[in-house]
Regions:
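Positively charged n-region of N-terminal signal peptides that target proteins for export
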Residues: 1-6
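Generic detector of short alpha-helix boundary/capping microenvironments
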Residues: 7-8, 72
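Hydrophobic helical h-region of N-terminal Sec-dependent signal peptides
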Residues: 8-17
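Surface-exposed, beta-sheet-biased, low-hydrophobicity segments with strongly acidic/polar composition
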Residues: 20-168
Length: 168
């Protein structure tokens, strides 16, 4: 009887350990901060949005890191936010992010998690897709070469790094 209890305890401990390892506490912290930012916060920053590209090069010029949050305005005049979960980890050429696009009343229009945005692709925040056609594109990951890269909002889309979004 004691042996069965010991084995059951060992199995329970192993299952709990595996469960804890499967969750990334850093990503959860990024998401918690991301979801603490509401539509009013995004709307307040909307006057500062710009069409300037954001440097994500593989050097000291990089302006973004994991956990950073961007606020955006789409070409369909919707505000939104995105959180960077992983940016070019191990030089993968991939950006992993979550995003929320709001309608004009501040209600969630579209929301997706764990979006994998590859280098040289474009993304549409109004539809939550990587469009086949360039028309209506919202954000482009522009790779000049293996080092120099930018996130480029295509006008009239605008972007802004959320202030004090550092989580690292």
């Amino acid at each position: 009887m004691e042996m069965k209890r010991t084995i059951a305890t060992a199995i329970l401990v192993a299952v709990l350990a595996i469960s804890c390892l499967s969750r990334n506490p850093t990503i959860e912290a990024y998401r918690n901060h991301f979801y603490s930012i509401n539509f009013m916060d995004v709307e307040t920053l909307s006057v500062k949005l710009t069409t300037e590209q954001i440097d994500i090069s593989r050097n000291e010029k990089r302006m973004l890191k994991d956990g950073d949050i961007l606020v955006y305005l789409t070409d369909e005049d919707r505000l939104g936010k995105m959180v960077i979960l992983e940016l070019d980890k191990n030089e993968s050429g991939m950006l992993l992010f979550d995003f929320v696009t709001y309608d004009k009343d501040g209600k969630v229009f579209i929301e997706k998690k764990d979006v994998k945005f590859n280098s040289s692709y474009v993304f549409d925040f109004d539809k939550g897709i990587f469009p086949k056609e360039i028309e209506g594109v919202k954000l482009w990951w522009h790779s000049i070469d293996d080092i120099e890269m930018y996130l480029v909002p295509w006008a009239p889309t605008k972007l802004l790094k959320y202030p004090n979004a550092e989580m690292n």
